[in-house]
Each structure stands twice: as structure tokens, then as C-alpha cells.
């Protein structure tokens, strides 16, 4: 999905970027403001987090895609004079709190509960040493597939290599200050046992949630009870990790993170992360809080519930770019992430792409495709919308691409799978989407007397048109039929002749009776693509009671 690494810095673009209100520019301007009056650091660090207790999912894609858009906007605003890096950080030292549902041989993982994910055996087979190693590899493969420019980081490696040692020692020195931030956020029971330090048990290898008996900042050790045995442990070298809220702030301070976005579920904790970062001598990064996705019933999507849409499912029915567009649009608005949003996202993507060459720079920088493709959107001609392909599959009962291409090639001269490979890909997506989501819900209904008369009149009107009539001619003929029928007259609209306009109920009736669906694209466009003769045959089938 990512575009070229070369950035266009022409003067018109730069002037438009300085004024742009597109959200990636708004976020990038915050980072620039952060260093106003001073020098930028050697590298501006963008970070995203990953919890390897599960495989990478659609939220992972969204976070990396959106952060990449902000990073690109920053590069443009600074004329690419400041180095940037996107760090994808895996929290693979977290304890395995529960066994995921989607792993083979769950019982074999029971003895490893609460061990760091990087110490849990890999249940998937292959060459990966641990559960986290496998999922981290899946993350990198996932990000590489989409062409993201990033650097992977492992919490286990950072802790064990000593990258966090200085901050851990500072956390011991400032233990009381950290506790003063954390305790008010906890209930009375948790307050009594809470510690920001989580030792890895030398006995069991588990991540221990135990109270501290003593924190020795000078020696850099903590003392606690491990299954009844008083134990003193060095806090450096990966023997101890921090609880997740202090860990967030510590990481920001240790690495000098400049920008991190997270879901709304983190919003109340952001102030805690910031304060911990400040206590440890760091400067909290700029935040961007995005809204969470909802399922078809408006419920929050949960990995454990599996009530959302996986990235593989989306990409079964639509190109990657449609998902990129969905991530760009309205990130601060709760949106439904379910199968029925896919067709619109596909058509909107190609509409934005088609508009791009005609736009000036101000409009281009407000066009999602500029952000999705790092300022270099491809030139793709998409002569048939996805929604129209779906109706064509529905009317023709096509089971393979060849049938659909028969209609497309007849309607649009010179368009073939070779000349338009993106359309060919979309044809395959449309067949799969129709088979899985439209066909099972298709319900034809019989026409009543008024509707039968309307369909007979429509059949006659189509019969008066040439066999190769275009969409506009068919649409006008259809409207002329509807204007003469009282049920379909809309007196709030006006026809070109000054009479009443046409109610949307007319075209809804056509789709319900002929296609078995509640709605569809512009009827004239559909009939032109399907064919005048074929559309008339469909009307005759409906009138003969062969559909309902």
C-alpha cells in the first residue's frame, strides 16, 4: 500500500501542505510545534505497539498505516530534512495471562501460563523458538506484505540486552513518585499489593504480581516473596519488567518517542503514561487517540470474542487499498467494521483515485489516496464500480470471471483482463463477496398489479431502445415510465417537463422484484452493462413468476 520513498517537494505542494487541514498534517504539525524554537533531534521517532498474545489483526494494520501517514506528512512539512523512524514494538515479555482460543493443543500450554510470551513454547510448529517469536515473525511478514517502512523491536531483547537498565535503575530511585501516581488509580485491594516492578521468578519462570518487601535503589535490587521464599533480584538484565502502565511511560522516556497513537480504551491512562515518562526524565510524546471499531451490532470489537472482521477476511473480498481508505477516513469516529462496509469502501477508493489527476494541490492533500500512497497514487482506470459488478453477478448468477467479462467486454470496448488487471481482480472479489454475503440473503418478491403494469411498461420502453443503448438513455426511459404512474410520482421533485419527479420507491421495486435485493446502483448503468435484451428477459421471468 505504501508508495515510493521519494518525496515530491514542489513549491505548490509545500504551500498547500502548510495550510492543509487533513488530519495527518494536523498531527505532524504538533510534532513540529514540539521542537519550536529549538533543534530537532537526530531522528524523530514514531512508535506503534503490538501485543503478541494474538496474531496481527486489522487494528495492527490500522495503527501502522495511520502512523505512516503522519510520518509522511511530517517529512513533507520538514522538506525531508529530518530523519524519521517508525518503531513497531512488541510487548513480548508480558506474561501469558490466558491461553488463546486459536492455538493447537491448548493443554500443552497450561504449564506455561504467566510466563513471558517469549518463554512460552511455540505451539504452531516450524522454526520459531517461542510463542512470541512465531507471532513476531507473523507481524513482520504482515507489515512487509503491505510495504510498510518500519523497524521491529522486541521488549524481551530490549530488557535482556540492557537497553532499559538505566531507566529501571531510575525507576527504583523514583519508586515513591511512581507509586504516588499509580496508587490513586487502583482500588483498595490492589493498592495493598501493587508494585510497578514485576520480577520473573527464578523458580518458575513466571511473571510475578507480588508486593515489594524492599526496593534498594543503590544496589539496583528488589526483595519479594516467591512462593514463600524471600528473594532478592537485580532489576537489570531482563530479570524484572515493569507493569504495563509504567512500562509505557518508561519506554517513551528510554527511547525518546515523539509520536504514538492508541485506541480510545487507553485514553484515561494516557495521563498516567505521561506522568511516569516525566518522572523518569523523559518528555511524553504527542498522542493521537483513535476511536475503536464496532461490530455489526454496534458492540466493541474484541480479539477474544472474535466478533469483528479479520484482515484476511477483508482482503478476500476487496483490495488492500479499500482497507487503507477505511483506516484514513474519520479515525476519531466510531465506525462499524463489518462485511457490509466493504463495497462502499472499494467504490470510494476508486472514485478518489479517479479524481486525483484533476485536482489542484489543496484538493490533492485532502484526498485520502495522496496519504495512502505516500504522495504517489497510481493511475488506475476503473470503468465498472464494485457495486455494479455485484448486481451483475446477482442478475447473471455468474460463477466465474469469464461470464462477467463477457458482459463487461461487450459494454466497454477495449477493456479486457489484460488491459485492466485491477478490474479483473475486482471481478474475482465481487464473485466471492456475492456468494458469501449477497446470495444467502437474496429474497425475491412477486410484483403487485401496479408493479406488474410498471414492469410491462418498462419492458416496452426498453424494447424501443437500440440493443447497445447507453446507461443514460436507459435511465431516462425508465424515469419516463415511472412519471406516468401515480404511485411513483414524487411531487417534491420536478421533471424536466415541469411535472412531478420520480420516487426512489420505483427503483427499489425493480431491485426487489428483479434482483432480490433491497437496493442497487443506478439502474440505467446496470441495465446497460447487463444488456437491454437480458434485462427484458429478466422482467419477463419476474412477470411469469419464475423468480419469486
Curated annotation (Swiss-Prot):
The protein's name in its UniProt record: Lysine--tRNA ligase
Main location: cytoplasm
Gene name of the encoded protein: lysS
Disulfide bonds: none
GO biological process: lysyl-tRNA aminoacylation
EC assignment: 6.1.1.6
NCBIfam families reported for this sequence: lysS_arch, PRK00750.1-2
Catalytic activity: tRNA(Lys) + L-lysine + ATP = L-lysyl-tRNA(Lys) + AMP + diphosphate
Family: Belongs to the class-I aminoacyl-tRNA synthetase family.
Placement of sequence motif 'KMSKS' region: 300-304
Keyword Nucleotide-binding: yes
Binding site for ATP: 303
HAMAP family: Lys_tRNA_synth_class1 (MF_00177)
Enzyme class: ligase
Renumbered ranges of motif 'HIGH' region: 52-60
InterPro entries (UniProt xref): aa-tRNA-synth_I_codon-bd_sub2 (IPR020751), aa-tRNA-synth_I_CS (IPR001412), aa_tRNA-synth_I_cd-bd_sf (IPR008925), Lys-tRNA-ligase (IPR002904), Rossmann-like_a/b/a_fold (IPR014729)
MF terms in GO: ATP binding; lysine-tRNA ligase activity; tRNA binding
Pfam families linked to this entry: tRNA-synt_1f
Keywords: Aminoacyl-tRNA synthetase, ATP-binding, Cytoplasm, Ligase, Nucleotide-binding, Protein biosynthesis
Coiled coil: none
Compartment(s): Cytoplasm
An example Gene Ontology CC term for this record: cytoplasm
Amino acid at each position: 500500500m505504501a508508495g515510493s520513498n521519494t518525496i515530491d517537494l514542489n513549491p505548490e505542494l509545500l504551500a498547500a501542505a502548510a495550510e492543509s487541514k487533513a488530519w495527518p498534517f494536523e498531527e505532524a504539525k504538533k510534532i513540529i510545534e514540539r521542537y519550536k524554537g529549538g533543534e530537532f533531534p537526530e531522528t524523530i521517532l514514531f512508535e506503534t505497539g503490538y501485543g503478541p498474545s494474538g496474531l496481527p489483526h486489522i487494528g495492527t494494520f490500522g495503527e501502522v498505516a495511520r502512523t505512516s501517514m503522519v510520518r509522511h506528512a511530517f517529512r513533507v512539512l520538514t522538506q525531508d530534512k529530518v530523519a524519521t523512524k517508525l518503531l513497531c514494538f512488541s510487548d513480548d515479555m508480558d506474561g501469558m495471562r490466558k491461553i488463546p482460543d486459536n492455538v493447537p493443543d491448548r493443554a500443552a500450554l497450561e504449564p506455561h501460563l504467566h510466563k513471558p510470551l517469549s518463554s512460552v513454547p511455540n505451539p504452531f510448529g516450524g522454526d520459531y523458538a517461542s510463542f512470541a517469536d512465531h507471532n513476531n515473525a507473523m507481524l513482520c511478514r504482515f507489515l512487509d506484505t503491505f510495504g510498510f517502512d518500519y523497524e521491529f523491536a522486541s521488549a524481551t531483547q530490549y530488557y535482556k540486552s540492557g537497553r532499559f537498565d538505566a531507566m529501571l535503575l531510575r525507576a527504583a530511585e523514583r519508586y515513591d513518585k511512581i507509586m504516588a501516581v499509580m496508587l490513586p488509580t487502583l482500588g483498595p485491594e490492589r493498592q495493598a499489593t501493587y508494585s510497578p516492578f514485576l520480577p520473573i521468578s527464578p523458580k518458575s519462570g513466571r511473571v510475578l504480581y507480588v508486593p515489594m518487601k524492599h526496593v534498594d535503589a543503590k544496589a539496583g535490587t528488589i526483595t519479594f516473596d516467591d512462593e514463600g521464599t524471600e528473594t532478592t533480584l537485580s532489576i537489570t538484565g531482563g530479570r524484572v519488567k515493569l507493569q504495563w502502565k509504567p512500562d509505557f511511560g518508561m519506554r517513551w522516556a528510554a527511547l525518546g518517542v515523539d509520536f504514538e497513537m492508541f485506541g480510545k480504551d487507553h485514553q484515561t491512562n494516557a495521563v498516567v503514561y505521561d506522568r511516569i515518562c516525566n518522572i523518569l526524565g523523559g518528555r511524553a510524546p504527542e498522542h493521537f487517540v483513535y476511536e475503536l471499531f464496532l461490530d455489526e451490532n454496534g458492540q466493541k470489537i474484541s480479539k477474544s470474542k472474535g466478533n469483528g472482521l479479520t484482515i484476511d477476511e477483508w482482503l478476500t473480498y476487496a483490495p488492500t487499498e479499500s482497507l487503507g481508505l477505511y483506516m484514513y477516513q474519520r479515525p476519531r469516529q466510531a465506525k462499524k467494521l463489518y462485511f457490509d462496509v466493504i463495497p462502499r469502501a472499494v467504490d470510494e477508493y476508486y472514485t478518489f483515485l479517479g479524481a486525483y489527476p484533476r485536482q489542484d494541490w489543496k484538493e490533492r492533500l485532502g484526498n485520502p489516496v495522496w496519504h495512502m500512497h505516500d504522495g504517489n497514487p497510481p493511475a488506475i482506470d476503473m470503468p465498472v464500480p464494485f457495486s455494479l459488478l455485484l448486481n451483475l453477478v446477482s442478475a447473471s448468477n455468474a460463477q466465474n470471471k469469464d461470464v462477467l467479462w463477457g458482459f463487461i467486454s461487450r459494454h466497454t470496448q477495449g477493456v479486457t483482463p489484460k488491459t485492466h488487471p485491477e478490474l479483473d481482480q475486482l471481478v474475482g472479489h465481487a464473485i466471492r463477496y456475492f456468494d458469501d454475503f449477497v446470495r444467502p440473503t437474496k429474497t425475491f418478491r412477486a410484483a403487485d398489479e401496479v408493479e406488474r403494469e410498471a414492469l410491462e411498461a418498462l419492458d416496452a420502453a426498453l424494447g424501443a431502445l437500440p440493443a447497445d443503448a447507453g446507461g443514460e438513455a436507459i435511465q431516462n426511459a425508465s424515469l419516463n415510465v415511472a412519471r406516468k404512474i401515480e404511485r411513483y410520482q414524487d411531487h417534491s421533485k420536478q421533471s424536466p417537463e415541469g411535472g412531478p419527479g420520480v420516487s426512489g420507491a420505483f427503483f427499489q421495486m425493480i431491485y426487489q422484484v428483479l434482483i432480490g435485493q433491497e437496493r442497487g446502483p443506478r439502474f440505467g448503468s446496470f441495465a446497460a452493462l447487463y444488456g437491454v435484451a437480458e434485462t427484458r428477459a429478466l422482467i419477463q421471468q419476474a412477470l411469469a413468476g419464475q423468480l419469486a
